[in-house]
Amino acid sequence: MQKNIHPKYFEIRAICSCGNIIPTYSTLDQHLNLDVCSACHPFYTGKQRRVNTRGRVERFNKRFSLSIMNSKKKE
């Protein structure tokens, strides 16, 4: 192998917003800040959060139906 062509690896910490710290190695020489990790992501924890989208769907349907009505009037 040739010398001095491989990147240097540093031991860093990936810090999640929930407080979980994940030690890892990277060529990046600084710590990473994560939004979610396996300790707090709903898929891994099994705690699914239901979002009430009824208002959003109704608003979309209302806008969409108005645009269809307007296009039919122009024809």
Swiss-Prot record:
Zn(2+) binds at residues 16, 18, 37, 40. GO terms for cellular component: ribonucleoprotein complex; ribosome. Keywords: Metal-binding, Ribonucleoprotein, Ribosomal protein, RNA-binding, rRNA-binding, Zinc. Binds 1 zinc ion per subunit. Pfam families: Ribosomal_L31. GO terms for biological process: translation. InterPro entries: Ribosomal_bL28/bL31-like_sf (IPR034704), Ribosomal_bL31 (IPR002150), Ribosomal_bL31_A (IPR027491), Ribosomal_bL31_sf (IPR042105). Its cofactor is Zn(2+). One of its GO terms (molecular function) is rRNA binding. Gene3D superfamilies: Ribosomal protein L31. Part of the 50S ribosomal subunit. Binds the 23S rRNA. Belongs to the bacterial ribosomal protein bL31 family. Type A subfamily. This is Large ribosomal subunit protein bL31. It comes from Baumannia cicadellinicola subsp. Homalodisca coagulata. The lineage of its organism: Bacteria, Pseudomonadati, Pseudomonadota, Gammaproteobacteria, Candidatus Palibaumannia. The gene is rpmE.
